Amino acid sequence: MNDIEIADLYQELIVDHSRRPRNYRRLENATRQAEGFNPLCGDKVKVYVDLENDVVRDISFEGEGCAISKASASLMTETIKGKSKAEVEQLFSRFRHLATGTGDGSGLGKLAVFSVLRGFPARVKCATLVWHTLHAALEQTANIVSTE
């Protein structure tokens, strides 16, 4: 896929997932949760995870934010359902490297469209906030995560 095709797909996915986010709800039976905040953009997100035997049975999110953060959260929740904790951590690492320009989109599926953010550090924080929040929820390392 060339850069123009990726940019077109990015636009389409961001608009779709920000207007109609998937898994945007409070997960009542969550076994893990964490909150994230991006002071630069004002994004706030809460991630809920139902983790059983180290497998993500269900995941959801709530929050306010820009189109990029909401779309990233929506796409992330679709991508990681049914994945093991180890697989999720690998996806998080790949996504972070993709968004910051140190990796490619292999193995990321639709998430690869976020490669267009490489030249925009503030937007990278919008896209990765939910991933850092998920990591904190899975590892139970912090209740509130900040991009700063």
Locations of regions flagged by a protein language model:
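Alpha-helical support elements that line or immediately flank enzyme active sites
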Residues: 72-84
